[in-house]
């Protein structure tokens, strides 16, 4: 499971070269290195599950989160391409794209901001880490053996 992540909200014109590189390194390069390390073992046993964690912003883009959105979109591209490449080896590759999940990444949000985000979500609540984990457990299991190259949104209907 490739789940490293950082977040930063700022205007695109204020993003430094270092911040851009760090965002891509953590989200995209981290997943690349993780997959590259795990794949030989999976290919050898002709079975494996690779799961990446992107974001709804990787699907639709987020204002003031251009670097984050670009890194997460790259992760979706990595997932889809790797699924096609490794399918013949018995390895599935899928992605979970969480929406607004109540994690440490939201620590700087006020209670009012969190309430407003919950209200925008069709299911009327913020997601939980357990809900994201449940989606990952499903995709890692035998029941998902014919699912590959997919992006599963865990976002309460915010992105459809």
Q: What is each PLM-predicted segment?
A:
Residues 11-12, 19-24, 106, 113, ...:
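Substrate-binding pocket helix/loop in short-chain dehydrogenase/reductase
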Residues 10-13, 60-66, 88-89, 124, ...:
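Active-site loop immediately N-terminal to the catalytic Tyr-X3-Lys motif
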Residues 55:
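Residue(s) in the substrate-gating loop at a strand-loop-helix junction
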Residues 35, 71, 79:
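Active-site helix of classical SDR
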Residues 60, 137, 148-160:
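Short C-terminal tail/terminal secondary-structure segment
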Residues 40, 84-88, 145:
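Alpha-helical segment proximal to the catalytic Tyr-Lys
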Residues 121-132, 143:
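A conserved structural motif in NAD(P)-dependent oxidoreductases
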Residues 6, 13-32, 47, 51, ...:
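Catalytic Tyr-X3-Lys loop
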């Amino acid at each position: 499971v490739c789940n490293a992540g950082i977040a930063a909200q700022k205007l695109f014109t204020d993003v430094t070269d270092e911040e851009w590189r760090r965002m891509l390194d953590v989200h995209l390069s981290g997943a690349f290195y993780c997959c590259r390390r795990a794949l030989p073992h999976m290919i050898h046993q002709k079975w494996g599950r690779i799961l990446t964690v992107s974001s709804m912003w990787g699907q639709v883009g987020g204002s003031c989160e251009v670097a984050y959105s670009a890194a997460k979109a790259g992760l979706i591209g990595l997932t889809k391409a790797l699924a096609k490449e490794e399918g013949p080896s018995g390895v599935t590759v899928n992605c979970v794209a969480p929406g607004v999940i109540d994690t440490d990444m939201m620590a700087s949000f006020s209670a009012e901001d969190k309430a407003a985000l919950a209200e925008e979500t069709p299911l009327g609540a913020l997601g939980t880490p357990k809900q994201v984990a449940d989606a990952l457990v499903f995709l890692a299991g035998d029941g998902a053996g014919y699912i590959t190259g997919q992006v599963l949104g865990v976002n309460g209907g915010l992105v459809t």
